Regions:
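Helix-turn-helix-type domain boundary/helix-start signal
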Residues: 27-28, 68, 159
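Core subunits and conserved enzymes of cellular information-processing
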Residues: 2, 65, 82-85, 258, ...
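Bacterial extracytoplasmic/cell-wall-associated proteins, especially those involved in peptidoglycan
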Residues: 106-296
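Terminal targeting segments of Actinobacterial cell-envelope proteins
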Residues: 1-33
């Protein structure tokens, strides 16, 4: 599906373990950083934005078509790097542009000026006249239109969340789900744990805090003092941990019915959801065995 927003420029996983012995590596309860390593699978579902705008000067009559793809789940820093490379600018230019007051990005007040979560995943046109400010502004404007749709606003309210909280939850679902089919189940786990006052304990939030992407989380990682450590802090993290797409957002406002509190991807394509902690521990043991075999 290709999304073409209107433009005036357009031409004609898991629970706390207080009683368990300290393991050498923290068992993985949720899907984590594989997304950044599997971008190729994401490209097929990226939303296309085929509007030739973002210009500040006249363009040549004929110019080779170029595009910038922002895959679902990319973090802001990844988007900034891609923008700099696409426009041939020094590294850090897009980041500085995004945080400058002159950028005038249409972010919600709750974002506190942080564009994370609002750099909408899509395919954007790039020309010789494209500027980082114009490109980032178009990403944010696109996100604002998508997230501000009546069904999203109503769906967020039905789940007891603000739209910004919904984007935060969607960014977690985007990072944790092993595949799109699991997103609505992962979203249900998030909702169930929030409703019970349980810490989310999502490894994807730790990865964000530590600026990495990995499938291994140590016990020490879960003890870091950081607002994105959802092992130590209850509730949602303060901001999105990436830029979610439509499927993750839809999963949060329309989660699958279920009583699940835990999940673990024991192998690619095999994610186990359960409300029973003992059963979950069995699944975790299988995951650990598989990881051990991978390491040799």
């Amino acid at each position: 599906m290709t999304y073409r927003p209107s433009s005036p420029y357009a031409p004609p996983r898991r629970s706390r373990r207080p009683s368990l012995p300290r393991p050498p590596r923290r068992p993985r309860l949720t899907r984590r950083g594989r997304l950044a390593l599997l971008l190729g699978a994401v490209l097929a579902v990226a939303v296309g934005v085929g509007v030739p705008l973002l210009l500040t000067r006249d363009e040549p009559a004929v110019e080779p078509a170029r595009t910038l793809l922002v895959p679902e789940g990319w973090r802001a820093r990844q988007v900034y790097t891609a923008v700099d490379r696409a426009l041939g600018l020094p590294e850090g230019t897009a980041r500085k542009t995004a945080t400058a007051p002159a950028a005038a990005l249409a972010l919600p007040r709750a974002a506190g000026g942080n564009p994370e979560g609002y750099l909408f995943p899509a395919t954007y046109p790039v020309t010789g006249g494209t500027t980082p400010q114009g490109l980032l502004k178009f990403m944010v404007d696109t996100a604002a239109k998508r997230f501000g749709a009546a069904r999203i606003v109503a769906g967020a309210k039905a789940q007891g969340l603000s739209v910004y909280q919904t984007v935060i939850a969607a960014s977690i679902v985007q990072a944790e789900a092993d595949n799109p089919e699991d997103m609505a189940k992962v979203a249900r786990v998030v909702h169930n744990r929030l409703a019970r006052g349980m810490a989310l304990q999502m490894d994807s939030t730790l990865n964000y805090a530590l600026g990495r992407s990995t499938v291994d989380t140590s016990y020490e990682d879960t003890r870091i003092r950081n607002p994105y450590n959802t092992y130590e802090r209850k509730g949602l993290p303060p901001t999105p941990i990436g830029n979610p797409g439509d499927q993750a957002l839809d999963a949060v406002i329309r989660p699958t019915d279920g009583d699940w509190l835990y999940f673990v991807t024991v192998a690619p394509g095999d994610t186990r959801f359960t409300a029973d902690y003992a059963r979950h521990q069995e699944n975790v043991a299988e995951f650990n065995a598989n990881r051990g075999a991978e390491r040799g």
